[in-house]
Amino acid sequence: MKNIVFIPKVKGTDEKRLREVAYDLSVESWKRWCDKNDCQLFVMEDLVHDYDYMKITWQRYYLFDMLDNNNVDYDQVLMVDADTIVHPDCPNFFQMSEHKYCGVNAVGSMDWICRSIENYSHFFFKDVK
């Protein structure tokens, strides 16, 4: 069993082509990191549902189903966005996690975070006012 780095990178429409170049760089950086640290890179290239039904930001949470359906045996899994680039000398964080659920604090846009909480909270916290 290997540790898995999971990246959703589904081809977009023509107006999203410029982003894909950056996403290719991201995938390449993670591929090199995985090779260096004896991990397996798993790139989600196909949608699970039509994009109009469910955005990719939600579809990525099917990752365990995708790994199981592709007969991927895994120890630990990292889910990372395709707009990240890992430093080539980044330590193998799988060796630091103690097999616990871990996350990173990503404070890119506080406005986006606040709007997300306001707009999605009623789906998850129906009783909270």
Where are these regions (language model features)?
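Conserved donor-nucleotide/metal-binding helix-loop-beta segment in metal-dependent transferases, i.e.
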Residues: 86-128
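Conserved beta-strand scaffold positions in the cores of enzyme catalytic domains, especially
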Residues: 41-43, 77-79, 101
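Short His-Asn-centered micro-motif
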Residues: 7-8, 45, 80-82, 88, ...
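Surface-exposed, flexible loop/turn segments at secondary-structure boundaries
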Residues: 13, 49, 85, 109-110
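N-terminal anchoring/stem segment of glycosyltransferases
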Residues: 1-74
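A broadly tuned preference for mixed-charge, low-complexity surface segments
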Residues: 2-3, 127-129
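Short linear motifs at secondary-structure transitions and domain/linker junctions
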Residues: 15-19, 51-54, 77-80, 114-126
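Short beta-strand-to-loop acidic/aromatic patch adjacent to the donor-nucleotide binding site
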Residues: 64, 74-85
